[in-house]
């Protein structure tokens, strides 16, 4: 294993998937171009460089930071000679080495991405709730299983989260808020451990009970499950929002309650973005924002549909960023093209 590979793997442990994946991907791309040239030309210009094949890091490309790192996608075609490519690899080595030296004693923190058996989330350690939770649903995965019981599940903290940043059950006790699921328990009944994991407090957020979590939010969750009868596959991203409000002085403020000794944030709103893939491979998107307040059950869910971009701006995230908007056939039930 080369020094640069060790550095990249070290970075993967400290910086998270996104940055390390970019470094390794960029390095691997140039290595492939270089090896192809050597094979074709018989050159041994880097015979003294011990570069081994490594699998790429799995990247979770469906949700990303709103300001992505710029990468030249035409880099391969611009590098016209083997020598230039060797130089490029050396520059990547220097880049990763310098970063490693600067951050020798660790990064203060990056998004904590947690992959469970049947869903993935990004945990917000400051607010003690998730930034987003991502699910993949289809008709087969939602088939009822008599051996699966919600009554066996217990709300519990995720031990993988540092104790400084966890929410605990006592934070919710007496708060007046429900421990509201982001990845709905009803979406994960194909195995007991799948539904069990939806009860980790990392998947919870303080939600108003009567009129919201137990009613209108539940209606939205049931609607999403219904979509598995319409689409071949359904992809769901759910999370909290903390939206500004105009106050008496005419200025906008972001104000939200915190509960418990761990100061768990109470979101002002929740979003849910859904992409359905049809049997003929068309993609359709729906986006919802609901206030964390009691909602009349007679209000149609379509009243809460919003442009997806409005959620992205408010959340500081780009959702389904591997899908160009012009590839969608419908957004919120309306034809895009």
For every predicted segment, state its role.
Residues 1-337:
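Domain-level detector for secreted/extracellular nuclease and nuclease-toxin modules, and
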């Amino acid at each position: 294993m080369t020094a640069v590979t060790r550095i990249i793997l070290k970075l993967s442990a400290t910086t998270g998937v996104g940055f390390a994946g970019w470094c390794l991907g960029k390095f691997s791309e140039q290595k492939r171009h270089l090896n192809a040239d050597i094979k074709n030309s018989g050159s041994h210009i880097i015979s003294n460089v011990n570069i081994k094949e490594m699998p790429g890091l799995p990247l979770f490309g469906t949700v990303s930071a709103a300001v992505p790192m710029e990468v030249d996608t035409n880099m391969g075609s611009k590098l016209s000679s083997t020598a230039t490519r060797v130089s490029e690899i050396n520059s990547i080595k220097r880049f990763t080495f310098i970063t490693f030296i600067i951050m020798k004693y660790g990064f203060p923190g990056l998004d904590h991405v947690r992959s469970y058996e049947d869903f993935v989330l990004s945990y917000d350690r400051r607010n003690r709730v998730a930034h987003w939770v991502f699910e993949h649903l289809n008709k087969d995965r939602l088939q009822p299983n008599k051996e699966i019981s919600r009554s066996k599940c217990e709300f519990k903290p995720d031990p993988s989260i540092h104790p400084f940043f966890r929410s605990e059950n006592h934070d919710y006790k007496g708060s007046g808020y429900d421990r509201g699921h982001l990845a709905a328990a009803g979406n994960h009944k194909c195995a007991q451990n799948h539904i069990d994991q939806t009860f980790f407090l990392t998947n919870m957020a303080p939600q108003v009970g009567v009129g919201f979590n137990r009613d209108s939010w539940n209606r939205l969750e049931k609607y999403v499950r219904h979509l598995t009868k319409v689409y071949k596959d359904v992809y769901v991203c759910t999370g909290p929002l903390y939206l500004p409000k105009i106050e008496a002085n005419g200025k906008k403020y972001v104000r939200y309650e915190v509960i418990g000794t761990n100061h768990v944030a109470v979101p002002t709103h929740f979003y849910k973005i859904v992409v359905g893939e049809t049997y003929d491979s068309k993609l359709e998107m729906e986006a919802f924002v609901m206030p964390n307040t009691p909602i009349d059950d007679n209000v149609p869910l379509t009243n809460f549909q919003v442009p997806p971009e409005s959620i992205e701006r408010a959340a500081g995230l780009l959702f389904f960023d591997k899908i160009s908007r012009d590839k969608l056939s419908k957004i919120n039930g309306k034809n895009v093209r």
